[in-house]
Amino acid sequence: MNMVSLPETINSPILYFLDVGILLGGLGVVFFGKIIYSALFLGVVFVCVALLYLLLNADFLAAAQILIYVGAINVLIVFAIMLINKPETKINKKKITFGDILSGFSVFGLFSFLIIMILNTTWLQPTLVSQEVKNSFQSIDIIGIHLLTDLLLPFELLSILLLVALVGAITIARKEISPKI
């Protein structure tokens, strides 16, 4: 398989463009009021991540990203939104509760911890990956071995996170039953 190696002068602007696309897509997911627009911006994020994989010459991961996330999960989200047809609800202004304050401090603490960890990490110089390293990760078998040996803990944590997101989505999508008096 021939690998495409782009020069650094071309690779860096494409990388920055994709990073901005991921950032703006993520902001679109969070800040758009209509949920269908949020789902479409989520698709933009998934496509940009797949293009990042292509930029890193990880063809298998890029194809898996497109097939699984864009082709299956994002389409499933859009279908669920269209089938539920839940009317938009107005946000009621309420007083700040103790849970809101506790959540705010938890999020602030988590982001502070992440920033400290990022600043204390020794990063490699941003150079292109050598041909030996590229060839070592081409095999699907090697990807599976790395996922189930070296990366087992992050792999399992990600599966738990996806399970929690699925339970949360089901809870949100479930129709509210009002008692009849």
Swiss-Prot record:
Record's bilayer topology term: Multi-pass membrane protein
Enzyme class: translocase
Gene Ontology molecular function: NADH dehydrogenase (ubiquinone) activity; quinone binding
NCBIfam families for this protein: PRK06638.1-3
Tagged with keyword Ribosomal protein: no
Coiled-coil stretches noted in the UniProt entry, renumbered to this chain: none
Catalysed reactions, as listed in the record: a plastoquinone + NADH + (n+1) H(+)(in) = a plastoquinol + NAD(+) + n H(+)(out); a plastoquinone + NADPH + (n+1) H(+)(in) = a plastoquinol + NADP(+) + n H(+)(out)
Family: Belongs to the complex I subunit 6 family.
Cell compartments where the protein resides: Plastid, Chloroplast thylakoid membrane
Binding partners and assembly: NDH is composed of at least 16 different subunits, 5 of which are encoded in the nucleus.
Record field: transmembrane: 13-33, 35-55, 64-84, 98-118, 152-172
Function: NDH shuttles electrons from NAD(P)H:plastoquinone, via FMN and iron-sulfur (Fe-S) centers, to quinones in the photosynthetic chain and possibly in a chloroplast respiratory chain. The immediate electron acceptor for the enzyme in this species is believed to be plastoquinone. Couples the redox reaction to proton translocation, and thus conserves the redox energy in a proton gradient.
InterPro entries, alphabetized: NADH_UbQ/plastoQ_OxRdtase_su6 (IPR001457), Nuo/plastoQ_OxRdtase_6_NuoJ (IPR042106)
Location (main, coarse): plastid
Keyword flag Phosphoprotein: no
Keywords, ordered alphabetically: Chloroplast, Membrane, NAD, NADP, Plastid, Plastoquinone, Quinone, Thylakoid, Translocase, Transmembrane, Transmembrane helix, Transport
Protein name listed in UniProt: NAD(P)H-quinone oxidoreductase subunit 6, chloroplastic
EC number: 7.1.1.-
GO cellular component: chloroplast thylakoid membrane
Pfam family, any one: Oxidored_q3
